[in-house]
Amino acid sequence: MSKLFDSRLADVIRKPVITEKATNALDLNQYTFEVDHRAAKPQIKAAIEALFSVKVIGVNTMNPPRRTRRVGKFSGKRSQVKKAIVRLAEGDKIQLFPES
């Protein structure tokens, strides 16, 4: 792949989601990431495979509703987020936590 294509794929994945539910899903070889809200499932799959050198079996996405935040009398909305749950092939693993 070209470097330009790789840099665009790197912009698709924002950060891993570390919650109790996401950590429990690691046992099922499922990893949860926050991704760009414009990204489609094939783009997310290509980005994960290129960045982590793993084989992706399936991608599930969700667009949770935007949350309203208040600061004093001013009300606003948080930025749009999209979550992707990525299922990897048997034997593949992504190192999210450093080994100690």
Swiss-Prot record:
GO terms for molecular function: rRNA binding; structural constituent of ribosome. It holds the Pfam family Ribosomal_L23. Keywords: Ribonucleoprotein, Ribosomal protein, RNA-binding, rRNA-binding. GO terms for biological process: translation. Signal peptide: none annotated. GO terms for cellular component: ribonucleoprotein complex; ribosome. The keyword Iron-sulfur does not apply. PROSITE patterns: RIBOSOMAL_L23 (PS00050). InterPro entries: Nucleotide-bd_a/b_plait_sf, Ribosomal_uL23-like, Ribosomal_uL23/eL15/eS24_sf, Ribosomal_uL23_CS. It comes from the Bacteria. Part of the 50S ribosomal subunit. Contacts protein L29, and trigger factor when it is bound to the ribosome. NCBIfam families: PRK05738.2-4, PRK05738.3-1, PRK05738.3-2, PRK05738.3-4. One of the early assembly proteins it binds 23S rRNA. One of the proteins that surrounds the polypeptide exit tunnel on the outside of the ribosome. Forms the main docking site for trigger factor binding to the ribosome. PANTHER family: 60S RIBOSOMAL PROTEIN L23A. Belongs to the universal ribosomal protein uL23 family. This is Large ribosomal subunit protein uL23. It comes from Prochlorococcus marinus (strain MIT 9312).
